[in-house]
């Protein structure tokens, strides 16, 4: 009898502890192929946070849509809230990027994504108007080493009077990498590049994008929230009457895991 009571008490204690540490989590999206989709990234309207939309393509690869083009996602780091997309390649035997028709990479400024300050942009086939810009278009610019050592950029050796480099991070390039006739016709990008290294030791081309910390999950009623951890209430910062599952007293919102936790 004593043993039975002890086991019952132990089971009850475990249930209470489980209840006390329970968290209210957002619905995570299923993997895209072999790639995990972390919160708040969303591949369908019913998972993640739809404001952070990306796509799982028919070939089971993740894709990031800009205003007028799409780019493959190469890697995701949920802890730093960043992912890396693959820049557009050059048209064969030319010094023109395939996305020049779209004027390069242009993010939607109303969405919670922006270009990080970790990217070095190599601009190719540029006009002399760039000499009036803060870009490094000098003879010492790393773009010359890139052109001379990169087979796919060999057509750039005789194209355009200039090539230039710059590091992202300014307000003018937080949402776009522009490619156009009046500026530069081609580009590449490298994350955390040390330009002093030989080109064969540069990382693979990539452009790092970061997302803003997500707010609490959207709700229509209390049924959409876990009452043990959160309460559906109006978002005072929204002019659209949006409601969210705000964490109950003693719990805080974890924007990386998408949960209310201690």
Where are these regions (language model features)?
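Typically disulfide-stabilized, N-glycosylated extracellular/lumenal ectodomains of secreted
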Residues: 2-262
């Amino acid at each position: 009898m004593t043993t039975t009571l002890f086991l019952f008490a132990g089971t009850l204690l475990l249930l209470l502890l489980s209840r006390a540490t329970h968290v209210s989590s957002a619905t995570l999206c299923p993997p895209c192929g072999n790639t995990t989709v972390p919160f708040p990234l969303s591949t369908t309207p019913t998972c993640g946070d739809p404001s952070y939309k990306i796509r799982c393509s028919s070939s089971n690869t993740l894709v990031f849509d800009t205003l007028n083009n799409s780019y493959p996602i190469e890697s995701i780091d949920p802890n730093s809230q960043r992912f890396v997309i693959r820049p557009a390649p050059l048209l064969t035997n030319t010094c023109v990027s395939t996305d020049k028709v779209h004027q390069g990479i242009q993010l939607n400024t109303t969405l919670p994504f922006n270009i990080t300050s970790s990217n070095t942009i190599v601009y190719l086939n540029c006009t002399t108007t760039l000499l009036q810009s803060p870009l490094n278009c000098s003879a010492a610019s790393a773009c010359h080493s890139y052109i001379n050592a990169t087979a796919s950029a060999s057509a750039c050796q005789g194209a355009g009077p200039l090539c230039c480099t710059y590091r992202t991070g300014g307000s003018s390039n937080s949402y776009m990498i522009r490619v156009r006739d009046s500026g530069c016709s081609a580009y590449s990008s490298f994350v955390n590049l040390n330009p002093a290294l030989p080109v064969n030791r540069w990382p693979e081309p990539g452009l790092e994008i970061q997302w803003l910390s997500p707010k609490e999950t959207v709700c229509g009623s209390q049924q959409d929230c876990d009452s043990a951890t959160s309460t559906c209430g109006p978002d005072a910062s929204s002019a659209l009457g949006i409601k969210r599952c705000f964490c109950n007293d003693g719990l805080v919102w974890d924007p990386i895991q998408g949960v209310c936790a201690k």
